[in-house]
Amino acid sequence: MVTWDIEVTDTFGGQANYDWVNRYETTTADDISDLALVRRIKSVTGYSGIRGRTYVSGDFVEIRFPACCVVIFANVRC
């Protein structure tokens, strides 16, 4: 099992602004696919069903929603 720390924050000029931030955590299986992981993260944060740009790099996930000026960062907890 893997625990993910998730941060949702606003953007300003395309960069994370941290004017406000919401933090979550979720636990997933070790062998979860990238698609299933992104769906889980979006579901936990309340952004499921909204299209965004996703970048997955091993133990880091970034999901950007340019229309909403929001970004989600997810990191594996060590």
Model segments located where?
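Short aromatic-glycine-(Arg/Gly/Cys) micro-motifs in beta-strand/loop hairpins
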Residues: M1-V21
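Polar, enzyme-active/binding microenvironments
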Residues: A29-I32, V38, S43-V44, F73-V76
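Generic structural motif
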Residues: T9-T11, A29-D31, C68
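Generic low-polarity alpha-helical segments
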Residues: G14-Q15, E25, V61-I63
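A short, exposed loop/beta-hairpin motif centered on an aromatic-Gly-Thr core
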Residues: Y18-I32
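Short, mixed-charge low-complexity intrinsically disordered segments
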Residues: V44-C78
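Hydrophobic beta-strand residues in large extracellular and virion-surface proteins
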Residues: W4-I6, L37, I41, I63
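General helical secondary-structure elements
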Residues: D19, L35-V38, Y47-G49, F60
